[in-house]
Regions:
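C-terminal catalytic domains of large/alpha subunits in multi-subunit enzymes
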Residues: 59, 68-69, 87-91, 99-100, ...
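A glycine- and small-aliphatic-rich helix-loop capping segment at beta-alpha/alpha-beta transitions
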Residues: 231-233, 241-245, 267-278, 304, ...
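Helix-loop-helix junctions that connect adjacent transmembrane helices in secondary transporters/permeases
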Residues: 160-244, 410-487, 686-707
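Thiamine diphosphate
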Residues: 261-283, 287-289, 501-509
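Active-site-proximal alpha-helical scaffold in enzymes
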Residues: 125-129, 270-277, 307-318
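Glycine-rich loop/linker segments at domain edges
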Residues: 7, 13-16, 82, 87-102, ...
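Short acidic, glycine/serine/threonine-rich loops at helix termini
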Residues: 76-80, 135-138, 237-239, 262-268, ...
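Flexible, low-hydrophobicity surface segments
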Residues: 1-169, 193, 271, 281
Length: 770
């Protein structure tokens, strides 16, 4: 078998992308296309009393202005986000009192109320983008402002203005999980108890490529063609068809190169449906590309979780039980409950905690909807348990590393069922710690601390273990075609946005089929070709796609033996396959794939294979962060960062390392500078541009020391877990622990994210002043 899996092969797609040959949505244009601009609400909550579009329609070039009333007349349906997780292993989230969950319909344009700042209320179609923007400026909307709430905790406490009249209390999810009786008994008998509350703030993805769509309607075929970058074209096709009130085969979605996702592109946006609908009404293709300011107002956002956690321990420091109350802010409507659904069952982290309960709540507020953002829900709960362990170690006067070691699940205990019921299939958590400490030169930290002190700096070292649960949409399909021209086509329904799928998927197919990686072409993104696929999210792509490619390749090899037996005039039982060739056992007679394809009926050497996997996998790792702080200014320098990740079997270690680098920076961004900030008095955004929303740059971080500790998962034939999210999961806790460690001499015990220099300086001053 040709060795391709596990090799650090350079990415096949890079030359195309680096030479400007990428196919991003805004790169496409259509003859006679027109442009769409969006009129957005200036209020976080208001009733729409009326709309005057006369001034806009009279402007040169304006072809039409469409409103929520027009949507209702044309019977456009709400976007079917289906926010509740659906796999066999997901939590059964319910509403208060075990009621059905109210999700808040997401109309393309509302006709009654706006429920968050920046919500679309009308669209203007014009000959040029400038004319469309001019028209949007003069659409006059009459609003009656309504009381609003944007605070997560306040929404959960009740008494805030209802976002939806159908749900006066604003709490749409309220479910509890775990062993309540066992937890209470452990709390009653414990020697020590620690409790803390944390807020993991709201952030947004800021993908390099702004949201864009080009839609056209063909009246002769009664069919829509929609170019739209996404996390999965198949899902977009299905949901847009429902919005437009047509059959799925009347919609074609094309999603080729995508300039960043991070979860923000995995759900349908109203602009996609609006452009398609407007194309039908105007009779011409319609194009829309968001600008960065619009993105800050209307891209789905992430995180925004309040959690209160309590941990009890015995006299020796062994964990006995944990209790958590997680409150997720879903914004103005439920686009996804993934953050609360995925995070809550992992509240115990990598640790042996015999009993636990978690209350999982989700609330509506007058904010942009939140969505599954890179490592959805897991960085939040990892932050909570890793910060709580540091607090417990301080209160018990124990070494925090020793406290972790004492309570980590041992490899001999695998597979391990955690107290909420998740079944960890594999992992060597102690080994992760040992490898990370060696790579980080843990024993040299005191020397570095003294050196920093001599320069007037405070050195801090932070530690975090993490474990994730990766599953995602359970169905994936591939089609493999051996082409007589001398290449292989692999059609797959995932959607890359920088992950290197064209290379890593090709490595799997190449090794199984015994062919060079360069022979394999990955086909994605056109729903006229890709019929089934779950897209890219939740760390699913390599595992789901790799598994179904292997299954299909195995069956294709068996078919190849049948064809080879005919060509070589031998019995099928005498045909063996090795290194891309079919050989008659004990002879030198053989034939390769492409010769077989040339000599067999067209299409015979092809296969369509589907697979369904409901079993999650559990990537895990250890991160160590080192910082230096200037106590006079609060300035922070990130000096060292080490990550050890168990991604299962790494198909391409170089690509995995690249994913880890990006994920670490994304997590550090939240910990250091990123925050969606709203004015509590007016509800207006204070972080609506890249001048105001902090983003880390390459110069803000050191060279990372990244290592792999590959423990294959037994749940799939390749042993894959996931490699795209671990850096984001561990880094916020590791960084915050480093900051608190640096400030321990002042008695600082916690600092909220983002730990900006101003926030650090204030913590020092407050500690000095008692």
């Amino acid at each position: 078998m040709t060795k391709a899996i596990g090799q650090p092969i350079r990415r096949k797609e890079d030359h195309r992308l680096l030479t400007g040959q990428g196919q991003f949505t805004d790169d496409f244009s259509a003859p006679d296309q027109v442009y769409m601009a969006v009129v957005r609400s200036p209020h976080p909550h208001a009733a729409i009393e009326g709309m005057d579009v006369a001034a806009a329609t009279s402007l040169p070039g304006v072809l039409g202005v469409f409103t929520g009333t027009d949507c209702a007349v044309d019977n456009l349906a709400p976007v079917p986000h289906s926010p509740l997780p659906k796999t066999d292993h997901d939590l059964n989230l319910r509403g208060p009192g075990d009621s059905d969950v109210f999700i808040g319909p997401h109309m393309l344009l509302p006709a009654d109320k706006v429920r968050h700042l920046g919500e679309a209320v009308a669209v203007v179609i014009a000959e040029t983008r400038g004319q469309a923007l001019d028209g949007a400026e003069v659409v006059s909307v009459s609003y009656t402002e309504l009381p609003f709430n944007q605070d997560t905790s306040a929404a959960a406490e009740g008494g805030t203005p209802p976002v939806w009249d159908e749900l006066p209390g604003n709490t749409c999810i309220d479910s509890s999980f775990g062993d309540a009786a066992g937890t209470e008994a452990a709390f009653a008998a414990a020697a020590h108890k620690v409790k803390a509350s944390f807020h993991i703030g709201r952030v947004t993805g800021v993908p390099m490529e702004p949201r864009s769509v080009l839609a056209s309607y063909d009246p002769e075929e009664d069919r829509y063609t929609i170019h739209a970058g996404s996390g999965g074209a198949v899902r977009q096709k299905r949901e847009l068809a429902e919005v437009l009130g047509v059959e799925p085969d009347q919609v074609r979605v094309l999603s080729y190169d995508v300039g960043g996702n991070f979860g923000t592109r995995n759900r349908v946006y109203v602009e996609f449906g609006l452009a398609a609908w407007a194309s039908r009404k105007i009779g011409r293709p319609v194009k829309y590309t968001s600008d960065r300011s619009e993105a800050f107002l209307s891209d789905y956002q992430g995180r925004d979780l309040h959690t209160t956690v309590e941990l009890v321990l015995d006299a020796e420091g062994s964990f006995l039980a944990l209790r958590a109350d997680n409150i997720s802010n879903v914004g103005a409507r439920a686009v996804s409950f993934s953050p609360i659904g995925k995070g809550s069952p992992l509240i115990s982290g990598n640790y042996r905690i015999p009993a636990a309960t978690v209350r999982s709540r989700a609330v509506f507020t007058n904010t942009v909807p939140t969505q599954a953002y890179r490592s959805s829900g897991r960085p939040e709960v990892t932050f909570a348990i890793e910060r709580l362990i540091e607090i417990a170690a301080r209160e018990l006067n124990m070494d925090p590393l020793e406290l972790r070691r004492r309570n980590l699940v041992d490899k001999e205990e695998m597979p391990y069922t955690n107290p909420i019921g998740l079944y960890y299939d594999s992992g060597h958590y102690h080994d992760n710690m040992a490898i990370a400490m060696t790579a980080a030169d843990w024993d040299g930290r005191d020397v570095r601390r003294k050196d920093a002190a001599a320069r007037g700096k405070l050195l801090g070292v932070g530690f975090a273990n993490y474990v994730e649960s990766s599953i995602g949409t359970p169905v994936e399909q591939t089609e493999i075609y051996i082409r007589p021209e001398g290449h292989v086509e692999v059609v797959i329904g995932t959607q890359p946005s920088g992950q290197g799928h064209e290379t890593s998927f090709a490595q799997v197919a190449a090794e199984w089929l015994g062919l060079p990686v360069s022979d394999v072409r990955i086909v994605i993104g056109d729903t006229d070709v890709v019929k089934v696929g779950g897209g890219s999210h939740s760390g699913r792509s390599m595992r789901m796609a790799g598994t179904v490619i292997v299954m299909a390749a195995d069956e294709l090899i068996e078919e190849g033996k049948e064809v080879a037996a005919e060509v070589l005039e031998a019995s099928v039982s005498d045909i063996e396959f090795q290194d891309g060739a079919f050989q008659v056992t004990g002879t030198d007679r053989s034939v390769g794939w492409y010769e077989l394809a040339q000599k067999s009926d067209p299409g015979r050497l092809s296969i369509i294979k589907s697979n369904e996997m409901h079993t999650p996998v559990f990537p895990n790792g250890t991160h160590i962060c080192e910082v230096e702080i200037d106590p006079e200014t609060g300035g922070i320098e990130l000096t060292r960062y080490t990550a050890v990740d168990d991604v299962g079997r790494a198909i391409n270690p170089m690509i995995v390392h690249g994913q880890t680098h990006g994920a670490i920076v994304q997590g550090l961004g939240q910990a250091m500078v990123e925050a969606c900030v709203l004015d509590p008095e007016t509800g207006q955004t204070l972080s609506g541009t890249l001048m105001d929303y902090g983003m880390l740059r390459a110069g803000d971080v050191p060279a990372f020391q990244v290592e792999l500790n590959e423990v294959p998962s037994p749940t799939n034939p390749l042993g894959i877990k996931a490699g795209g999210e671990g850096g984001t999961t561990g880094s916020p806790a590791a960084f915050t622990n480093a900051i608190v460690n640096a400030l321990k001499g002042y008695g600082v015990t916690h600092i909220e994210m983002p730990a900006t220099p101003q926030r650090v300086w204030r913590a020092i001053q407050n500690a000095k002043n008692g």
